[in-house]
Structure formats: C-alpha cells, structure tokens
Design a protein with these regions (language model features):
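C-terminal motif of bacterial Sec signal peptides marking the signal peptidase cleavage site
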Residues: 15-19
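Surface-exposed, beta-sheet-biased, low-hydrophobicity segments with strongly acidic/polar composition
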Residues: 20-186
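Bacterial N-terminal signal peptides that target proteins for export
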Residues: 1-8
C-alpha cells in the first residue's frame, strides 16, 4: 500500500514538470505549414469536387462523403461568396463544441495565436478577396476536450468554375493555439 501512496504523492511533481515547457501536454509534434486550398461550391459543381474544409486534417474534403468537416464554401445566387460552418448547414455536432469562423481585421501574418472566443457557429459568413479568417474545429482532441485552429486568407474566386482559393496555416496539435509557421510553442 505504501508504494501506491508514494506514487500518488509524486504525481503533482510530474504534472508540474511537464508544464514547464509552456504546454502541459508536452511539446508539439506537428509543424504548422502554410498551404493553398481550392474548394468548389456546394451547389453547381461536379459531385467529386471538394467543397468543405477539415481543420484537423488541414485538407479539403467532399461533403457528400463525410460530415467530418468544419466549414463549406458556396457561391450564392447574386454572386455572394460564403463560408458555412457545419451548424449553418443543419449538421449537428456530437462533440459538444460547434466549429466556427471568426472574421479578423488583422493581417494574415499579424495573427499569431487563435482567440478562444468570438467564433460564428450558426451564421453564413460572407467572404471577400484578402479577407482573413480564423477557424476553430469541433472537439477533435476528445481525450482532453479541445479543438484545433487555423487561419486563412482568401486569395481569389473563379466564378465560372464556382471556386475559392485560399491560403491556410493550420495548427493540428491538440491544446496549441499558435498560428505561425514551424513547431508551435503554445
């Protein structure tokens, strides 16, 4: 019985030591990398065209094959370009935290850390060229109950092909919010 008590007494020291690097989960293992993504509109494109984005994988996905995405793109009648968070599409989220989008007045390079709050989860978000957006995933790190984050900047629209092109930097490390290239510290 005494060895168990001894081990239990050492646990707080182990947690304290692991927290010395700035994140109690230990160092990040996945580097933040800048990428360029093209999405086709939900309506009016070929069925095989990816029209949604999953922050956790940092990739475009087909919304007809999975609901494991955070937002989708559409070109509405009248020419308005929009991103739609999952809930705006009527997709319920069982993780307890709905994916969201946050329009930013900061430059793409000026965003170095994802905010914790302020994300639009239910509303359609109108987008424009050079618009900067921070995206929050659903709870993909279920063992610790946190989302992952990304920042993106709209580069261009192709109305004829009903596409949007954007650059994205996703931090796919659980518990980290840094949005700068390389291995994040936080």
């Amino acid at each position: 019985m005494r060895p168990i008590i001894f081990i239990l007494c050492l646990l707080p020291f182990g947690f304290a030591a692991s927290g010395c690097n700035g994140n109690p989960l230990g160092p990040a293992t996945l580097p933040n990398v800048l990428d360029t993504v093209v999405l086709g509109a939900l309506v009016g494109t070929e069925i095989g065209t990816p029209s949604a984005f999953a922050v956790a994988s940092g990739s475009a996905v087909r919304s007809d094959q999975t609901s494991q995405f955070d937002f989708a793109y559409n070109l509405e009648s009248g020419g308005r370009h929009v991103f739609l968070p999952q809930a705006a599409l009527g997709i319920s989220n069982s993780s307890g935290l709905a994916p969201g989008l946050l329009l930013s007045d900061e430059s793409f390079s000026g965003i170095t850390e994802a905010p914790l709050n302020g994300y639009s989860t239910l509303d359609t978000v109108t987008i424009a060229v050079n618009q900067v957006i921070v995206a929050r995933s659903s709870l993909v790190c279920t063992s610790i109950g946190v989302p992952v984050y990304a920042k993106l900047r709209i580069l261009s629209f192709d109305d004829a092909d009903r596409q949007v092109t954007f650059e994205v930097l996703a931090n796919r490390n659980c518990g980290f919010r840094d949005l700068v290239p390389g291995l994040p510290d936080n």
